[in-house]
């Protein structure tokens, strides 16, 4: 069953097409990876999905609802969360504080309730804390929960950003170069986390990634982009053996 669908998306910058008539669908519970050389249009596509960029043509559907005109700040409320290649964390806040901020989109109490810490506000805070602690346990971040972000190794910071995305209870998780900057051991761990996110939490994942060994291990299907157009979509072995993909992406 299709959870997410892109139909005929075109994006132009100054007359240059960054994406040209791109269409694909992602099944519920799938790990779907987008690959391609630098400048292929991968980040542009993620920015269109996140509603940061406005396409000149095409539609985006999530849960069969057209979200093409949805405001960027409302995307997370629909159940779509995203991590970034360049980490977007609060350096002088703790891991716990960063994760609690990931729950702010669900805030239902007003400022007055917050100031006087009313029963409703206390109940909401308790619910937020329970969810955050679940995610901390899930990603094995207990040791770092009260540590400031600026005191953490890069690999742990990446995990914290993933955790913050999970704190929004997404149905769809967008991962932008999740293995970038990680050691081999950390990349292996990331693969296990992703499979757990898929199988245990039931979250669908769309990922941009350059590490083809990692891509082939974790992906259910792969889409290859080049110069803003789709070269191929298929299973990892199909993409690995596709002549056009080898030429464009692997230089063979």
Residue ranges and their predicted role:
Residues 2-252:
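Glycine-rich phosphate-binding loops of nucleotide-dependent enzymes
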């Amino acid at each position: 069953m299709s959870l997410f669908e892109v139909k005929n998306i075109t994006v132009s910058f100054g007359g240059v097409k960054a994406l040209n008539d791109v269409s694909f669908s992602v099944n519920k519970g799938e790990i779907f990876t987008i690959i391609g050389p630098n400048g292929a249009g991968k980040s542009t596509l993620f920015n269109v999905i996140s509603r940061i960029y406005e396409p000149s043509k095409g539609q985006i559907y999530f849960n069969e609802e057209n979200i093409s005109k949805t405001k960027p700040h409302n995307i997370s409320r629909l159940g779509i969360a995203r991590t970034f290649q360049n980490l977007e964390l609060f350096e002088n806040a703790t891991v716990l504080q960063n994760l609690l901020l990931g729950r702010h989109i669900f805030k239902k109490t007003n400022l007055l309730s917050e100031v006087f810490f009313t029963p409703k506000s206390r109940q909401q805070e308790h619910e937020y804390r329970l969810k955050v602690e679940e995610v901390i346990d899930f990603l094995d971040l207990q040791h770092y929960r009260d540590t400031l972000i600026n005191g953490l190794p890069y690999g742990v910071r990446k995990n914290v950003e993933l955790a913050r995305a999970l704190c929004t209870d997404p149905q769809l998780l967008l991962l932008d170069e999740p293995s970038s900057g990680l050691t081999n051991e950390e990349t292996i761990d990331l693969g296990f986390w992703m499979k757990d996110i898929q199988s245990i939490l039931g979250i669908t994942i769309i990922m941009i990634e350059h590490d083809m060994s990692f891509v082939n291990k974790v992906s259910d299907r792969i889409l290859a982009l080049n110069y803003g157009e789709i070269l191929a979509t298929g299973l990892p072995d199909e993409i690995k053996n596709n002549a056009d993909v080898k030429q464009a992406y692997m230089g063979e």
